[in-house]
From Swiss-Prot:
The name this protein goes by in its record: Ribonuclease pancreatic
Gene3D superfamilies: Ribonuclease A-like domain
Entries under InterPro entries matching the protein: RNaseA (IPR001427), RNaseA-like_dom_sf (IPR036816), RNaseA_AS (IPR023411), RNaseA_domain (IPR023412)
Family the entry assigns: Belongs to the pancreatic ribonuclease family.
Pfam family, one: RnaseA
UniProt feature, compositional bias: Basic and acidic residues: 33-43
Amino acid sequence: MALEKSLALLPLLVLVLLVLGWVQPSLGKESRAKKFQRQHMDSDGSPSSNPTYCNDMMKRRNMTQGRCKPVNTFVHEPLVDVQDVCFQENVTCKNGQANCYKSSSSMHITDCRLTNGSRYPNCAYRTSQKERHIIVACEGNPYVPVHFDASVEDST
């Protein structure tokens, strides 16, 4: 009797395991768009003269785990404005790809650079506030930023 009940539940167990095996790899995997937002967007943070901004943000955004990320840029503009860059001037990316776009207007950014002699786990960054055009790589559907390629000064 117990064996019959166990055998009746076997197909259900197999189905559950198959679904878990299919869904599980995507659980916890950050999309490229979400990674871009985590690493580069700080819409709420207004640029300030806080000299520890980069040290704090790089740690808070998990970019000092296992190593010190040498360079990072935070953009202090609304996410929708940064996403709109994907439909502005098409430029060639540093790696030669053709999916980069340059913002039509300058944006408030913070440039974070690892200081000389700084080593993991004591990552120390130099914080620089700038107003620059940004260049981002875009992909997907919807077409959104997935990589911060560069920032450039106004060419006027």
